[in-house]
UniProtKB/Swiss-Prot annotation:
Organism (species): Saccharomyces cerevisiae (strain ATCC 204508 / S288c)
EC number, UniProt record: 1.14.13.-
Any one annotated GO CC term: endoplasmic reticulum membrane
The protein, known as: Thiol-specific monooxygenase
Quaternary data: Monomer.
Gene: FMO1
């Protein structure tokens, strides 16, 4: 295939990954006909959080990023100067909207279908057949290439080994952080937050402004980086007694008078719309019982290209990364793979890419590896150039962990001050 060949590309999802793919392909392969399928009525993916219709959405009212805007920006598209160093969810959505208007909206080669759900994707002869459904009809369309950009924040990951937990969920005493919106429900209540990732730390801290007591339950309490004085770090939960409102920890300690348990325990990868044979190859046997979801992915070259059919790819599957610039870098790789300018390895251990969580600092190695792949082939005039991870950005990334710890200390002090004033939580004044 050459850059002048007319081909059809489907992008499933209108969040950061889908938008980045549309920008990169429309610039690099202008003869491609691109169709974007967006389940929501607007772009943004998880960052689209209409406050009047927030039920079922991942975001919460007072959320800010855990990565600075200096790292998050797309190639050649900086944030506005007045945006805080750690942008709010609203700042991010406005940034994505501006990105969409600048690079995607009103482009002749790009069609976007809002409020349209992809219900089935299957290989039919030499093309991919997509079945999609909007409010009026069901449609089938054929494409040469497909990029799955549906994200991985739809199926909550919850523990299955805590005795008695089902009754807590049945009585709305336990829920996943996906359903957290703000702290008001916890006023003068005793709450356990399970997990100390970014969301777990942030939610626990926000709760201290109104809750009577906040516990943070994690595997290794001694390693907890939460600096909030109003949060007590405890061991993992062994069992939960709804009748007595008590929780027994793995060290034998019993916590009494518990009102709520919030699980900030992450999400499964889930692709229920992909035909079963392909889904099995990508998700493995799964862990949730419905074969639609899994904690790991398989048979993906460089965490994105389906090795058994390189006309199918997945964008932004890795976690603990800098997603916006990575999405454009991955899309630039996909361009070359789809054009057959960049060969992929199709014979390797299918479990080799099972985990997509990068340990601290390892994401930089991944960016460098992808950039090296791009540099290994001739780049054509007009091709998209993604963010290059130079020394400045590498230093910013390496310092981002301690920078965020310092930010968390400030947020904890802010929450303590609000509690003394008996004021509800809100984000502190922006620092740009």
């Amino acid at each position: 295939m050459t850059v002048n060949d007319k081909k059809r590309l489907a992008i499933i999802g209108g969040g950061p990954g889908g938008l980045a793919a549309a920008r990169v392909f429309s610039q690099s392969l202008p003869n491609f006909e691109i169709e974007i399928f967006v389940k929501d009525y607007d772009i943004g993916g998880v960052w689209h959080y209409p406050e009047q219709k927030s039920d079922g959405r991942v975001m919460y009212d007072h959320l800010e990023t855990n990565i600075s805007k200096k790292l998050m920006q797309f190639s050649g598209f900086p944030f506005e100067e007045n945006v805080p160093l750690y942008p709010s969810r609203r700042n991010i959505w406005e940034y994505l909207k501006a990105y969409y208007k600048t690079f995607i909206a009103n482009k002749d080669a790009i069609s976007i279908h809002f409020s349209t759900e992809v219900t089935y994707l299957k290989k039919k002869n030499s093309q991919w057949e997509i079945t999609s459904k909007d409010e009026l009809r069901t449609t089938k369309s054929d494409f040469d290439f497909v990029i799955v950009a549906s994200g991985h924040y739809s199926v909550p990951k919850l523990p299955t080994n805590i005795a008695g937990l089902d009754l807590w969920f049945d009585n709305k005493g336990a829920f996943h952080s996906k359903d957290f919106k703000n702290c008001e429900f916890a006023r003068e209540k005793v709450v356990i937050v399970v997990g100390n990732g970014s969301s777990g730390q942030d939610i626990a801290n926000q709760l201290t402004t109104v809750a009577k007591k906040v516990y943070n339950s994690i595997k290794e309490p001694a390693s907890n980086q939460l600096k909030a004085k109003l949060i007590e770090t405890v061991q993992t939960i062994d069992s939960a007694d709804w009748k007595n409102r008590s929780v027994t920890l793995s060290d034998g300690r019993v916590l009494q008078n518990i009102d709520y348990i919030i699980f900030a325990t992450g999400y499964y990868y889930s692709f229920p719309f992909i035909e079963p044979s392909v889904r099995l190859e990508v998700l493995g046997e799964g862990v949730t019982g419905d074969k639609h979801s899994s904690v790991n992915l398989h048979n993906l070259w460089e965490h994105m290209i389906y090795v058994k059919d390189p006309t199918l790819s997945f964008i932004l599957t890795p976690q603990l990364v800098i997603p916006f610039p990575l999405s454009e870098l991955q899309a630039a790789i996909m361009v070359e793979v789809f054009c057959k300018s960049l060969p992929i390895t199709t014979t390797f251990d299918s479990n080799a890419c099972g985990t997509h969580n990068f340990p601290k600092g390892k994401d930089l190695e991944y960016y460098a590896e992808l950039q090296e792949l791009l540099n290994s082939i001739p780049r054509r005039v007009g091709h998209f150039e993604p963010v290059v991870w130079d020394d400045r950005l590498i230093d910013l990334r390496n310092s981002s962990y301690t920078d965020k710890e310092e930010r968390n200390v400030l947020l904890a002090e802010h929450a303590q001050a609000l509690k003394k004033k008996k004021a509800p939580y809100f984000l502190p004044a922006p620092h740009t």
